[in-house]
Amino acid sequence: EQVRAVVDVADAVICPGFIDIQSHSIYPLMVDGRCVSKITQGITTEIMGEAWTPAPVGGRNPGGLLTSVYGEPVERWVERSRGWTRFAHWLEAFEEAGVSPNIGSYLGGGTLRRCAMDMDMNPSSGKQRATMRRVMAEAMEDGAFGVSYALIYPPDCYADVDEIVDVCEVVGRY
């Protein structure tokens, strides 16, 4: 194949795109999918999902995006997000919206727990854990990287070791 152009990169630094391994850009991407502040720094991939993801909604998790901080630019996503009953639905919505960076995500442990028991502070029951295992398996099938808990924040902090191990056993099958 013939070279079409030669670019002089003398005195320049050439590198692949950077990966933000703990991105909190879910809301900023809803406001402006170009994510200019990250792209101009060379960040081309964002990994999300620490403790929370906007999907799936269902079961005891009523969903609902918080619009108080971002206001109107996020409100246009509120109705749409009510239908995100699978983890893949919000990733597909970002893709359809044409967000600039590559996106990868864990299922937020708090979101997972809310699907089974909302903000209940009690240990999970067998039935609730079965719900969490099912939702976790669906998320893995939908492309989740795994599960991520932030054990200092509710409802993640209410999960005991046995519950977390139970969920991680599902992740381990994928």
Which functions belong to the PLM regions below?
Residues 11-13, 132-133, 151:
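Short hydrophobic "helix-edge" motifs at membrane interfaces and signal-peptide entry regions
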Residues 31-145:
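Divalent-metal coordination cores built from histidine and acidic residues
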Residues 17-26:
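Metallo-beta-lactamase
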Residues 1-17, 32:
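Histidine-rich, glycine-flanked metal-binding segment
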Residues 24, 51, 108-110, 150-154:
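Active-site beta-loop-alpha junctions enriched in small/polar residues
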Residues 1, 98-100, 173:
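Short, well-ordered coil/turn elements that cap or connect secondary structure elements
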Residues 142-174:
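Active-site core of metal-dependent hydrolases
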Residues 25-26, 123-127, 154-162:
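Alpha-helix capping and helix-loop boundary segments enriched in small/acidic/polar residues
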